[in-house]
């Protein structure tokens, strides 16, 4: 776009930024920094080797929002290590086109007795009774349903390139493809993590003690 004669260079830069904002919305830094300020978290700007992230203290746990590249794709993820005394695992994602096929091939899909939730989500766990107890919370189901794209799980450490977890420590994990810049969805994810950790403690599936690992 040509610079108008009456504009100085700063005016032109602001105009270009305004047009880009109209086309693509606010940038990741702007959204994540505002989110951190609202939820009393810490925004950490990225550099050459490490991307930006938001770190929130939730009781004895740290919930970390960042991005990761995998197979030339970018994913937004949230992670929260916690003490998992019984090794409870689950994985929840939205039902998609091929979900029915995988069920026909014998893939696990636990039903919790809530018709709409069972219709919309695929649930896997090493303890079906316990995951039903977790999802008996209406707030848990509401926070999960709020997310249009979700892969939510308890898993062990991130392998060779991630932090190594002590014995008995696992992490609550969320990811979706792309860079998530929707303020309300991001805020809802932090609420989801806080609610899940609280429910796991009530169930005896998490301890309210620091996990002894930093991401």
PLM region spans:
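Charged, low-complexity intrinsically disordered regions
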Residues: 2-21, 28-215
């Amino acid at each position: 776009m040509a610079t108008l004669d009456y504009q100085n260079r700063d005016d032109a830069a602001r105009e270009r930024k305004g047009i880009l904002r109209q086309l693509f919305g606010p940038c990741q830094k702007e959204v994540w920094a505002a989110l951190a300020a609202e939820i009393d978290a810490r925004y950490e700007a990225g550099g050459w080797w490490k991307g930006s992230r938001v770190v929130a203290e939730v009781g004895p746990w740290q919930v970390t929002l960042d991005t990761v590249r995998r197979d030339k794709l970018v994913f937004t993820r949230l992670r929260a290590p916690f003490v998992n005394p019984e090794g409870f695992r689950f994985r929840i994602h939205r039902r998609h086109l091929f979900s029915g096929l995988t069920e026909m091939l014998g893939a696990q899909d636990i039903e919790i007795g809530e018709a709409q939730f069972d219709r919309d989500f695929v649930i896997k766990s090493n303890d079906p009774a316990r995951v039903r107890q977790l999802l008996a919370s209406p707030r848990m189901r509401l926070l999960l349903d709020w997310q249009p794209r979700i892969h939510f799980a308890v898993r062990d450490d991130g392998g060779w390139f991630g932090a190594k977890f002590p014995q008995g420590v696992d992490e609550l994990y969320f990811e979706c493809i792309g860079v998530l810049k929707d303020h309300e969805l991001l805020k809802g994810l932090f609420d989801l993590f806080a609610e899940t950790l609280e429910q796991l403690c009530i169930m005896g599936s998490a301890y309210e003690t620091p996990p002894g690992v930093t991401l």
